[in-house]
C-alpha cells in the first residue's frame, strides 16, 4: 500500500509530502496538514512503521517471515508517502494506499476504487484489513489461476513494543468502551490515544 495524494497538479504530492512531516501547533496547520500530522502520530505509535527503508531492505526483513507479516515504510516514489510491504505466498510485495479528500484507501484499478472502503487514518485502514483477514482466513488455500492471496495478519515491529502498548492492544481487543472501565482517568486517556487492535 502506498499513500498517494490524488491531486491534478504535478506538485500536489510534493506539497502533501511536506505536510506529512509538518510539526507545530494544530492551530498553525491547515485542516489537511492537521489530518496528516495526526495520521503520522498514530502511525508512529504502532511500532511497525519503519520510516525510511528501500524496497530491497523491506524484502530482506520479510524474506523469512511467515505469510501475512507486514510493515509500513516511507515510499521511495515521489508521488506517494507510504508503502506497506507484506509477505505473500509468492514472497514479499508492496501495496499502495491513496490519500484523497482527507481519507485513506487501498490503491486499485479504476473500476474497483469506488467500492473500496475509506478511512480517516492509515492505522484504521490497516486495523480493518487485519480484522477482515482474521475473519476470512481459515487455513492455507491454494491460489487459483496464478492469483496470490494477500493476508495482513501480523505486524513486523521495529523493536519490541512496550508492555503498556501490548496491554492497550489487549484491552482494545476486549472492549470498545474504554470510558466505562473501572480505571483512573489518566489510564483511560492513554488507552484512548490508540484505539486499534493491531
From Swiss-Prot:
<keyword id="KW-0734">Signal transduction inhibitor</keyword>
<dbReference type="GO" id="GO:0005131">
    <property type="term" value="F:growth hormone receptor binding"/>
</dbReference>
<dbReference type="GO" id="GO:0005126">
    <property type="term" value="F:cytokine receptor binding"/>
</dbReference>
<dbReference type="GO" id="GO:0060749">
    <property type="term" value="P:mammary gland alveolus development"/>
</dbReference>
<protein>
    <recommendedName>
        <fullName>Suppressor of cytokine signaling 2</fullName>
    </recommendedName>
</protein>
<dbReference type="GO" id="GO:0046426">
    <property type="term" value="P:negative regulation of receptor signaling pathway via JAK-STAT"/>
</dbReference>
<feature type="cross-link" description="Glycyl lysine isopeptide (Lys-Gly) (interchain with G-Cter in ubiquitin)">
    <location>
        <position position="173"/>
    </location>
</feature>
<dbReference type="InterPro" id="IPR001496">
    <property type="entry name" value="SOCS_box"/>
</dbReference>
<keyword id="KW-0597">Phosphoprotein</keyword>
<keyword id="KW-0341">Growth regulation</keyword>
<comment type="subunit">
    <text>Substrate-recognition component of the ECS(SOCS2) complex, composed of SOCS2, CUL5, ELOB, ELOC and RNF7/RBX2. Interacts with IGF1R. Interacts with DCUN1D1.</text>
</comment>
<dbReference type="InterPro" id="IPR035862">
    <property type="entry name" value="SOCS2_SH2"/>
</dbReference>
<dbReference type="GO" id="GO:0043434">
    <property type="term" value="P:response to peptide hormone"/>
</dbReference>
<dbReference type="GO" id="GO:0032355">
    <property type="term" value="P:response to estradiol"/>
</dbReference>
<dbReference type="Pfam" id="PF07525">
    <property type="entry name" value="SOCS_box"/>
</dbReference>
<dbReference type="GO" id="GO:0140031">
    <property type="term" value="F:phosphorylation-dependent protein binding"/>
</dbReference>
<dbReference type="GO" id="GO:0035556">
    <property type="term" value="P:intracellular signal transduction"/>
</dbReference>
<feature type="domain" description="SOCS box">
    <location>
        <begin position="151"/>
        <end position="197"/>
    </location>
</feature>
<dbReference type="InterPro" id="IPR036860">
    <property type="entry name" value="SH2_dom_sf"/>
</dbReference>
<dbReference type="GO" id="GO:0016567">
    <property type="term" value="P:protein ubiquitination"/>
</dbReference>
<feature type="domain" description="SH2">
    <location>
        <begin position="48"/>
        <end position="156"/>
    </location>
</feature>
<feature type="region of interest" description="Disordered">
    <location>
        <begin position="1"/>
        <end position="31"/>
    </location>
</feature>
<dbReference type="GO" id="GO:0019221">
    <property type="term" value="P:cytokine-mediated signaling pathway"/>
</dbReference>
<dbReference type="GO" id="GO:0045666">
    <property type="term" value="P:positive regulation of neuron differentiation"/>
</dbReference>
<dbReference type="GO" id="GO:0040015">
    <property type="term" value="P:negative regulation of multicellular organism growth"/>
</dbReference>
<dbReference type="GO" id="GO:0060396">
    <property type="term" value="P:growth hormone receptor signaling pathway"/>
</dbReference>
<keyword id="KW-0963">Cytoplasm</keyword>
<feature type="modified residue" description="Phosphoserine">
    <location>
        <position position="52"/>
    </location>
</feature>
<dbReference type="GO" id="GO:0009968">
    <property type="term" value="P:negative regulation of signal transduction"/>
</dbReference>
<dbReference type="InterPro" id="IPR036036">
    <property type="entry name" value="SOCS_box-like_dom_sf"/>
</dbReference>
<dbReference type="Pfam" id="PF00017">
    <property type="entry name" value="SH2"/>
</dbReference>
<dbReference type="GO" id="GO:0005737">
    <property type="term" value="C:cytoplasm"/>
</dbReference>
<keyword id="KW-0833">Ubl conjugation pathway</keyword>
<dbReference type="GO" id="GO:0043161">
    <property type="term" value="P:proteasome-mediated ubiquitin-dependent protein catabolic process"/>
</dbReference>
<dbReference type="InterPro" id="IPR000980">
    <property type="entry name" value="SH2"/>
</dbReference>
<dbReference type="GO" id="GO:0007259">
    <property type="term" value="P:cell surface receptor signaling pathway via JAK-STAT"/>
</dbReference>
<feature type="region of interest" description="Interaction with AREL1">
    <location>
        <begin position="1"/>
        <end position="75"/>
    </location>
</feature>
<feature type="modified residue" description="Phosphoserine">
    <location>
        <position position="30"/>
    </location>
</feature>
<dbReference type="GO" id="GO:0007595">
    <property type="term" value="P:lactation"/>
</dbReference>
<comment type="pathway">
    <text>Protein modification; protein ubiquitination.</text>
</comment>
<dbReference type="GO" id="GO:0032870">
    <property type="term" value="P:cellular response to hormone stimulus"/>
</dbReference>
<dbReference type="GO" id="GO:0060400">
    <property type="term" value="P:negative regulation of growth hormone receptor signaling pathway"/>
</dbReference>
Amino acid at each position: 500500500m502506498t499513500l498517494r495524494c490524488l491531486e491534478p497538479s504535478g506538485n500536489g504530492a510534493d506539497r502533501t509530502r511536506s505536510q506529512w512531516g509538518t510539526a507545530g501547533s494544530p492551530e498553525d496547520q491547515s485542516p489537511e496538514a492537521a489530518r496528516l500530522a495526526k495520521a503520522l502520530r498514530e502511525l508512529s505509535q504502532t511500532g511497525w512503521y519503519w520510516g525510511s527503508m528501500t524496497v530491497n531492505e523491506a524484502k530482506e526483513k520479510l524474506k523469512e517471515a511467515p505469510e501475512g507479516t507486514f510493515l509500513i515504510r516511507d515510499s521511495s516514489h515521489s508521488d506517494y508517502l507510504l508503502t506497506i510491504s507484506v509477505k505473500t505466498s509468492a514472497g514479499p510485495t508492496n501495496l499502495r494506499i491513496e490519500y484523497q479528500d482527507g481519507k485513506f484507501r487501498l490503491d486499485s484499478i479504476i473500476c474497483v476504487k469506488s467500492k473500496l472502503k475509506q478511512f480517516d487514518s492509515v492505522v484504521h485502514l490497516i486495523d480493518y484489513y487485519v480484522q477482515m483477514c482474521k475473519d476470512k482466513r481459515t487455513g492455507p488455500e491454494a491460489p487459483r489461476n496464478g492469483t496470490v492471496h494477500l493476508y495482513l495478519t501480523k505486524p513486523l515491529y521495529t523493536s519490541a513494543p512496550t508492555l503498556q502498548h501490548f496491554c492497550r492492544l489487549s484491552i482494545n481487543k476486549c472492549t470498545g468502551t474504554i470510558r466505562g472501565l473501572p480505571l483512573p482517568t489518566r489510564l483511560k486517556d492513554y488507552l484512548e490515544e490508540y484505539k486499534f487492535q493491531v
